[in-house]
Amino acid sequence: MNTPIKFTTAEEAVKVIKSGDHVHLSSVASAPQCLIKAMCARGEAGELKNVHVHHLHTEGPAPYADPKFEGVFQLDSLFVGANVRKVTQSGYADYIPIFLSETQKLYRSGAVPCNVAMIQVCPPDKHGYVSLGTSVDATLAAIECADHVIAVVNKYVPRAFGQAMIPLSKIDLFVQDDQPLVEAKFSEPSDVEKAIGAHCAELIEDGATLQMGIGAIPNAVLAQLGNHKNLGIHTEMFADGVLPLVRKGVINGEAKKTEPGKMVSTFLMGSQEVYNFIDDNPGVLMMDVGYTNDPYVISQNDRFVAINSAIQVDLTGQVCADSIGTKFWSGVGGQVDFVYGASLSKGGKAIIAMPSITTKGVSKIAPVLDTGAGVVTTRNHIHWLVTENGAVDLYGKTLQERARLVISIAHPSAQEELDRAAFERFGSHHHYIKGYMQK
């Protein structure tokens, strides 16, 4: 069935947006830039007021968040990316704290209205279906709930399978705009990050199912897994680092209980190579975030290993991953979804991995979290903590035992101060690292 599409211009399409509307934008590389530009032009012309914009992490410009649009556009993001970090910290934009698994529920429950969904899709196939490509996440829920769905048809959007495939009947307005997707570039792992990767890799067994983010530490972990067997991927996102392991047959999904033989994700960031990899690839399923990040679904896979990072960890194992003090840096994301899911998995491991010290020489392990810092993963949820100095398992450990273990993998320059803080907090009847506290 060849379904004809009647295209309109971006300028005409965004006329469905009214003052006071809530507008969802598809995520990461799929942010529909031509529609964003046209929407902002209406704002510049004084045609819109109090339009709420929602999205997860996006790559590329975010002009609607410019302070000059105060009173015109209000960004209430579901994750704070680099392109909106400063305006969020200054108060011109805002953030909705929420587990990634529940972002779709905001729309489906009506807690956040969705009047207009602006998305990108690949050209339709002969059956009248298009693909959301790199962004299913909460975008699928937005499409289901929106009064108007505007789709940019872009030949560069990969034809991904799973719940990314939607019928043309779900879309109200079509705009043609063939633009290469934004590519995310990642630096080579440092020696510290390579050491962290090696410690994490030692915790991964053959037949494990993996979740990890993107960036230097995940890439360092993946680089250490070349001799593993029968690994699987069930994650919220992946990037180029998995591709060598897929080609080598290390990642084949054969041991997975859910979608055996398939890689499962909800959004993607990376180079054109990873976009090409998911194009027309039945071995990759792009699914709704309510599925990928459901702790119960995650837990069905034995030996599930979740690797996430942190900004700061205290002596009891509280993990801050969304803010630096009172300043939001990112968001809750899916960390807790996967930490909890992995902890419920038979033989699973939930890992928080980070350098022991910042590039400015500040210890990331602290006696207490900074004032205003958000607790993302609680001390009740944390299991493994990894730095370049080693890996410690905090599960089932007392507060004093945790303090000793956490200090043992802190940066040497910080251990004496942490020793002293532990002594002052927990009393004098236990010694910690350097004999500051002697029984």
Summary of predicted features, one role per range:
Residues M1-K439:
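Conserved alpha/beta enzyme-core scaffold
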